Curated annotation (Swiss-Prot):
Official protein name in the record: Large ribosomal subunit protein bL34
MF annotations from Gene Ontology: structural constituent of ribosome
Species per Swiss-Prot/TrEMBL record: Blochmanniella pennsylvanica (strain BPEN)
Family classification: Belongs to the bacterial ribosomal protein bL34 family.
Recorded GO CC terms: ribonucleoprotein complex; ribosome
Biological process, per Gene Ontology: translation
HAMAP family, alphabetized: Ribosomal_bL34 (MF_00391)
Keywords (A to Z) from UniProt: Ribonucleoprotein, Ribosomal protein
Amino acid sequence: MKRTFQPSILKRNRTHGFRVRMSRRQGRKILSRRRSKGRVRLVVSVLNIH
């Protein structure tokens, strides 16, 4: 049986990346919440995976 998680950096960034977050109203809300909470990493990026 095939596993459900097949990692792809491109798909990950297109769904959860900074540019996508900024392009949508709800995404900007997510970023502001994470900023106010004091998160070091606001979004998932290629650098955060390694």
